[in-house]
C-alpha cells in the first residue's frame, strides 16, 4: 500500500489515479495524520503531494522526510519538504512557472529507468531550491536543461527519499506514469 499525503491540491488525485494502477492507495490530508499514524498504517511507500504554500505550512510533510525511513517520493511541495527537512533553504524560483513545459536532464538513477534524457516535464511552482545549497545528504538528480539549471530532482544519500520539483502526474510530463511506476514497483517495493 502506498500512502499519499494530500497537501490540499487537486493534483493529488491525479497521483492517486497513477499510483492506483500499481498498488493499493490510502490518502490522508497533511493535517489528518502524524508520524505515529503513518507507522500504524505501515505503508510500502509514501507520496507527498503538491500543494499551495511553503513546506512549513504543509502539515506532516516535512516530518515524513525528517522522521521516517519509509520509501518516499515528494512531488513539487513534497520535494521542497524533503529539501527543507534536511536544512536546504526553499526560496523564490528565478521565475514563476505554472502550467509550462520544460526540458529536464536526469542522472539515470532508478526513478528515471526507461525515461529519455532529456525529457519534457510540466512545471507549476514559484519556489525552488539551489543546487549550491543542497547538503551532503541530498544530491541533485535532475535539473532544467537551460541556462538556469533549476533543481528538478533530489535523492537522499542514505534514506530511500526522492523529490521531484516537476509534476509527473501532469499531462505535460513525458513518461510521468513511468516515473510513478518506478517509484511504486521498484523503490517502494525494494
Curated annotation (Swiss-Prot):
One of its GO terms (molecular function) is anthranilate synthase activity. Residues 1-190 form the Glutamine amidotransferase type-1 domain. Component I catalyzes the formation of anthranilate using ammonia rather than glutamine, whereas component II provides glutamine amidotransferase activity. Its EC number is 4.1.3.27. It is an enzyme of class 4 (lyase). Tetramer of two components I and two components II. Disulfide bonds: none annotated. One of its GO terms (cellular component) is cytosol. L-glutamine binds at residues 51-53, 80, 126-127. InterPro entries: Anth_synth/Amidotransfase, Class_I_gatase-like, GATASE, TrpG/PapA_dom. It catalyses: chorismate + L-glutamine = anthranilate + pyruvate + L-glutamate + H(+). Keywords: Amino-acid biosynthesis, Aromatic amino acid biosynthesis, Glutamine amidotransferase, Lyase, Plasmid, Tryptophan biosynthesis. It comes from the Archaea. Gene3D superfamilies: 3.40.50.880. Pathway: Amino-acid biosynthesis; L-tryptophan biosynthesis; L-tryptophan from chorismate: step 1/5. One of its GO terms (biological process) is L-tryptophan biosynthetic process. Pfam families: GATase. The active site is at residues 76, 167, 169. This is Anthranilate synthase component II.
Amino acid at each position: 500500500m502506498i500512502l499519499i499525503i494530500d497537501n490540499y491540491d487537486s493534483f493529488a488525485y491525479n497521483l492517486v489515479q497513477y499510483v492506483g494502477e500499481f498498488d493499493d492507495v490510502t490518502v490522508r490530508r497533511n493535517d489528518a495524520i502524524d508520524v505515529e499514524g503513518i507507522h500504524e498504517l505501515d505503508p510500502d511507500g509514501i507520496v507527498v503531494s503538491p500543494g499551495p504554500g511553503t513546506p512549513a505550512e504543509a502539515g506532516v510533510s516535512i516530518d515524513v522526510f525528517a522522521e521516517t525511513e519509509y520509501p518516499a517520493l515528494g512531488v513539487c511541495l513534497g520535494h521542497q519538504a524533503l529539501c527543507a527537512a534536511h536544512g536546504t533553504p526553499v526560496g523564490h524560483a528565478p521565475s514563476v512557472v505554472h502550467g509550462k513545459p520544460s526540458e529536464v536532464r536526469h542522472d539515470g538513477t532508478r526513478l528515471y529507468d526507461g525515461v529519455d534524457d532529456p525529457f519534457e516535464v510540466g512545471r507549476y511552482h514559484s519556489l525552488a531550491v539551489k543546487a549550491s545549497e543542497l547538503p551532503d545528504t541530498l544530491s541533485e538528480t535532475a535539473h532544467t536543461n537551460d541556462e538556469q539549471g533549476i533543481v528538478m530532482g533530489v535523492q537522499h544519500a542514505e534514506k530511500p527519499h526522492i523529490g521531484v520539483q516537476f509534476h509527473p502526474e501532469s499531462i505535460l510530463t513525458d513518461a510521468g506514469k513511468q516515473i510513478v511506476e518506478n517509484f511504486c514497483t521498484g523503490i517502494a517495493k525494494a
